[in-house]
Swiss-Prot record:
Organism this protein belongs to: Rickettsia rickettsii (strain Sheila Smith)
Protein name, per record: Porphobilinogen deaminase
Family as reported in the entry's similarity comment: Belongs to the HMBS family.
InterPro entries referenced in this protein's UniProt entry, alphabetically: HemC, Porphobilin_deaminase_cofac_BS, Porphobilin_deaminase_N, Porphobilinogen_deaminase_C, Porphobilinogen_deaminase_C_sf, RPE1
Cofactor(s) this protein cannot do without: dipyrromethane
Gene3D superfamilies assigned: Periplasmic binding protein-like II, Porphobilinogen deaminase, C-terminal domain
Membrane spanning residue stretches: none
EC number(s) per entry: 2.5.1.61
KW Transferase (keyword) present: yes
Cellular component terms (Gene Ontology): cytoplasm
Residues found modified as S-(dipyrrolylmethanemethyl)cysteine: C242
GO biological process annotation, one example: protoporphyrinogen IX biosynthetic process
Keywords of the record: Porphyrin biosynthesis, Transferase
Pathway membership: Porphyrin-containing compound metabolism; protoporphyrin-IX biosynthesis; coproporphyrinogen-III from 5-aminolevulinate: step 2/4
């Protein structure tokens, strides 16, 4: 086991918060490991005056960080999963995620509490084509203008009257401690599906780095890791970019995902904690989606008792046509469900 880890991340306040959350998890299992944060300025951070879809998409927030990982200048990278494209360059892999936070979007406005309440022809600041598609579906009269920058800068633009409202991710507002219920209003999933992977912090490593894999095995939140598979499969199959209105949100139907592993263990071993400790490392399990082998075979057995429901959204490039689809599947076939939804919805959009 290594004594020190170099952790690559963006320099934004939110990215550094995410990185420190990962470090907290690492320290729980490996208290003696020294964690060095390596801040990296990405192309996406530097170019703020153009929409992401005009300059290469969200991958610009990863490019320099992934290159540092490939060059072995860092040992692992921390990302917001919503920024990670469906296809990751070899030999890199998302090997761990932290428990998902509330992935809903937030309507941020000083005078009104919802998109419906905005006056005719009001201006909403948002660069995300997903949000633009939902906004125009709800209120076709509203003007959606390009709105780049970090959370603080966007809120400042709102306060100075540059726009009438904006839409931001709840998790970012919460983690930065700037969620204010006086002008921040949660948007329900039925009105606006979140970005794929929203609310999830992801850890990326090189596949052949066994030391980092061991760490990821320990900190990985398996219920979340399984939950995002249909969302990510949907994204990967479509090879979607920032020009494509796309969304998906998965949830467990059978139990609280925080407790699924414990429930499964209790079912199998009837509370025999000594047997649990022995059996947890009894054999290996290879994850088909990553090719990685995890030494946590029984914990993932919660899949036998858990169904996942995923709501998908796909729009055409100009957002004039949007289709929705829902898949309910056993956890073991959730990746296939994402691919199935992508095929069906792509056909519907192209008609």
């Amino acid at each position: 086991m290594t004594n020190s880890i170099r952790i690559g991340t963006r320099k934004s306040p939110l990215a550094l918060i995410h990185t420190n959350l990962v470090i907290q998890q690492i320290k729980q299992f490996f208290p003696d490991i020294n964690c060095e944060i390596v801040p990296i300025i990405t192309s996406g951070d530097l170019i703020q005056n153009k929409p992401l879809y005009d300059i290469g998409g969200k991958a610009l927030f990863l490019k320099e960080i992934e290159q540092a990982l490939l060059d072995k200048k860092i040992d692992l990278a921390v990302h917001s999963l919503k920024d990670v494209p469906g296809r990751i360059p070899e030999p890199l892999v998302i090997a761990a995620v932290l428990e998902r936070e509330d992935p809903r979007d937030v309507f941020v406005c000083l005078k009104y509490k919802s998109i419906e309440e905005l006056p005719q022809n009001a201006v909403i600041g948002s660069s995300a084509v997903r949000r633009k598609a939902f906004i125009q579906k709800i209120r076709p009269d509203l003007k959606v203008t390009v709105f780049r920058g970090n959370v603080d800068s966007r809120i400042k633009k709102l306060m100075t009257g540059e726009v009438d409202a904006t839409i931001l991710a709840y998790t970012g507002l919460k983690r930065l401690e700037v969620f204010n219920p006086e002008y921040c209003h949660l948007i329900e999933y039925s009105q606006m599906l979140p970005c794929i992977g929203q609310g999830v912090i992801a850890v990326e490593i090189r596949k052949d780095d066994n030391a980092m894999l061991e760490i990821c095995n320990q900190i990985n939140h398996l219920p979340t890791f399984e939950l995002i598979k249909p969302e990510r499969a949907f994204l990967e199959y479509l090879d979607a970019n920032c020009r494509t209105p796309i969304a998906a949100y998965s949830q467990y139907l059978d139990a609280n995902p925080r407790h699924l592993s414990k429930l499964a263990y209790r079912e199998v071993f009837e509370g025999n904690t000594e047997a649990l400790a022995t059996a947890a490392y009894k054999s290996n399990r290879t994850d088909a989606s990553t090719g990685l082998t995890y030494k946590l075979p029984l914990e993932v057995e919660f899949g036998k008792m858990s169904n996942i429901q995923t709501n998908f959204m796909l729009g055409n490039l100009d957002g004039s046509k949007i289709t929705f689809h829902t898949e309910t599947t056993n956890i073991k076939t959730s990746t296939e469900a994402g691919i199935k939804a992508a095929k069906m919805m792509l056909e519907a959009i192209c008609k």
